[in-house]
Regions:
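Structured, hydrophobic secondary-structure cores that serve as assembly/anchoring elements
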Residues: 89, 94-118, 142, 175-219
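Alpha-helical scaffold segments that mediate packing/assembly in large oligomeric complexes
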Residues: 106-190, 313-327
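Sequence/fold signature of self-assembling virion shell proteins
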Residues: 2-45, 53, 159-180, 214-327
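Assembly/oligomerization interface modules of large self-assembling protein complexes
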Residues: 32-99
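Short helix/loop capping segments that flank catalytic or ligand/cofactor-binding pockets
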Residues: 70-73, 112, 211-214, 304-306
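Short, flexible loop/turn elements at secondary-structure junctions
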Residues: 66, 204-208, 299
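Structural beta-strand/beta-sheet cores of well-ordered domains, especially the beta-sheet scaffolds
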Residues: 58-60, 100, 198-200, 240, ...
Length: 327
């Protein structure tokens, strides 16, 4: 009986892998991936207090400290007025969810041979990076919406006399006033009673680094600032007590009156906002009606503000940034 053999294509080759086109090809590894932003979540939010919440719609309750009320002046023989201590609470719910579903044909796995483990690890790593990218946008967006009403705008601060800029009237930062800007942000948090040395952060757009470098060199030329505590090396990582975190996720808007990009800048205490996220389910399933396998992953994320008065936000433009052309 004739031996079984693979079907031969009209070209005379059993598969494209046997053609001269495929001969001599050597695998040289994978090119360098794009420059993904390093995760900063744990540096700007409390990621441990909600750690036990791993399912969508789970809720955790926080109690605010009890209030006893102010002391009253005493007069001889007066009838005492009593106060009753009060306490309220608030809840944070984990309500965000997202999934990733990837189909891989078994034939692709066989053809990949020894390269399959690297390929598999590559798309699993990228799936996590894409999830983390979603978390960055969600966290920064929600934190900006959670800033206390006295800690933003043109009338910020305890007395309403600190200007942090608005979308339509942003602060224009230059080497002449950049240090004053950091002082304003710090003062707002100090007046709110939420300044904790060594635990404060400031998330700035990457465009801020250009202004900081220009400021550093300008002051060195005029004032010999080489030993300044504000700038060490070419990157400022701590300014006036703020740990500086650069992020691409602070999206600007355009002020059409000036044609400048207006950026939000977020600062505060790293315990002010609670946030958690996790991939809670991951399965590898063989698909029906096809020779394929399905990678399924489900992630949940969410959080909420605990101390809104411990966050502050400003709107700024940069003298080192160019103008946006008219539409």
């Amino acid at each position: 009986m004739a031996q079984n053999s693979m079907p031969v294509q009209a070209s005379g080759y059993k598969s494209i892998w046997d053609t001269p086109l495929a001969k001599g090809v050597k695998f040289a590894g994978t090119i360098i991936d794009r420059n993904w932003e390093e995760s900063f979540i744990s540096r700007i939010a409390n990621t441990s207090i909600l750690q036990d919440l791993t399912k969508c719609a789970q809720m955790i309750q926080f109690k605010r400290p009890p209030q006893a009320g102010p002391w009253r002046p005493y007069e001889l023989n007066q009838t005492l007025i009593t106060d009753q201590p009060t306490q309220d609470s608030f809840c944070i719910t984990i309500c965000g969810s997202a999934y990733k579903s990837l189909k891989i044909d078994k034939e692709d796995i066989r053809r990949a041979c020894d390269d399959w483990p690297e390929f598999e690890q590559g798309f699993l790593d990228d799936s996590w990076r894409q999830f983390e990218n979603l978390l960055h946008y969600s966290l920064l967006g929600r934190m900006q919406l959670s800033v206390g009403s006295r800690n933003l705008g043109a009338r910020a601060g305890r007395d309403g006399n600190i200007n942090l800029g608005t979308l339509t009237s942003a602060l224009h930062l230059s080497p002449d006033n950049i240090l004053n800007f950091f002082t304003r942000m710090k003062m707002v948090l100090q007046q709110a009673g939420r300044w904790y040395e060594g635990e404060m952060f400031m998330v700035v757009p990457e465009e801020m680094s250009v202004l900081l470098l220009e400021t550093m060199f300008a002051k060195q030329l005029c004032c010999n600032m080489s030993e300044s505590l504000l700038f060490k090396g070419l990157v400022a990582t701590n300014i006036l007590g703020f740990t500086i975190i650069e992020s691409q996720r602070l999206r600007p808007t355009i002020d059409r009156q000036t044609n400048r990009l207006v950026y939000p800048i977020l600062a505060g205490w790293n315990e002010a906002y609670a946030f958690t996220a996790d991939i809670v389910d991951a399965d590898l399933v063989e698909m029906e009606r096809s020779f394929g396998v399905l990678y399924k992953m489900l992630g949940v994320y969410g959080g909420g503000v605990i101390y809104p008065e411990a966050l502050t936000k400003a709107y700024v433009t940069f003298s080192t940034a160019g103008l946006v052309p008219n539409p």
